[in-house]
Regions:
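A general structural signal for well-ordered alpha-helical segments in protein cores
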Residues: 1, 29-30, 41, 59-62, ...
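Glycine-rich cofactor phosphate-binding loops and adjacent beta1-alpha1 units
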Residues: 70-74, 106, 112-191
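Rossmann-fold dehydrogenase core element
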Residues: 167-169, 179-219
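Mid-domain Rossmann-like dinucleotide-binding core that forms the NAD(H)/NADP(H) cofactor-binding site
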Residues: 46-128, 132-133, 146
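NAD(P)H dinucleotide-binding glycine-rich loop of Rossmann-like/cofactor-binding domains
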Residues: 1-81
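C-terminal hydrophobic helical "lid"/dimerization subdomain
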Residues: 108, 156-160, 200-248
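Structural detector of well-ordered beta-strand residues that form the stable sheet scaffold
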Residues: 41, 79, 102, 167-169, ...
Length: 248
């Protein structure tokens, strides 16, 4: 809207009235969109249209989540939970920024891909001993965990990986509830933070990295727009690696 406190702070993605296409307003699967102002346009350089479209969605979401981790010092470890499209994008962006995260998922194929791309280590969260293994690898516990699943089990897993004063950043929208004894929060000094997409400034920063060739492209699969129902079903079933791009 441009007028609410969030918009005035440059956080238009958190606009109080909200006008997001495909969420608040219809039009998420439209083949054309009217852009109301040039500030919403970004130079994609030589990147293909299909790949560039992923940066404005999963790319921006992953970049903003990583920024919320804040400055890291020697020995600070970051755990990425969920190696789907957004998680893989976060891995690529993290590597471009000199961060080598640990990746966690329940899919061995996705974990193998994450390891090939450069993850420091990968762990299957279906194995209940992996939290202990992460603690051994990190010399204690991790500083930050970013949860790209957003389920009760994944958040609890991330919390178990954190040291005192660490933070968990929740991106995923799977659902469920988190039951934590309130004294645990101040006594552990841990931070639980949500994040949703990202700001225009962050989008500009991300595209600078993209144009400079610092972010390796993730796997994308193009499908015609009339296959949207099947694409959503494949996403829900976990059959998609990387991102699906619909073409009208």
């Amino acid at each position: 809207c441009g007028d609410c406190p969030s918009c005035r702070r440059g956080e238009e993605h958190l606009c109080t009235p909200g006008r997001g296409l495909g969420t608040v307003a219809p039009g998420g699967f439209a083949d054309h969109v009217m852009v109301p102002h040039p500030r919403y346009l970004f130079d994609k350089g030589d990147v293909s249209d299909s790949l560039a479209s992923t940066y404005a969605c999963s790319g921006l979401t992953a970049y903003s989540a990583l920024k919320k981790v804040g400055p890291l010092t020697e020995g600070d470890e970051v755990v990425l939970i969920g190696a789907g499209g957004v998680g893989m994008m976060a891995l690529q962006i993290a590597l471009a920024q000199g961060i080598q995260p640990i990746v966690v998922d329940i899919d061995e194929n996705k974990l193998a891909t994450a390891k090939e791309l450069g993850a420091k280590a990968v762990f299957n969260s279906g194995d209940k001993t992996t939290v202990k293994q992460i603690k051994q690898l990190t010399g204690g516990v991790a500083y930050a965990a970013i949860d790209f699943v957003g389920a009760e089990a994944s958040v609890n897993y991330g919390m178990a990986c954190l040291r005192k004063g660490g933070k968990i950043i929740i991106v995923g929208l799977y659902g469920g509830a988190l039951n934590i004894p309130l004294p645990f929060i101040p006594m552990s000094a841990r931070i639980i933070q949500g994040t949703y997409v990202g700001s225009l400034q962050e989008m500009g920063e991300l595209m600078e990295l993209v144009r400079a060739g610092k972010i390796a492209p993730i796997r994308i699969e193009e499908r015609p727009l009339d296959q949207v129902t099947q694409a959503l079903a494949d996403l829900k079933a976990g059959r998609v690696q990387g991102r699906v791009v619909l073409r009208g």
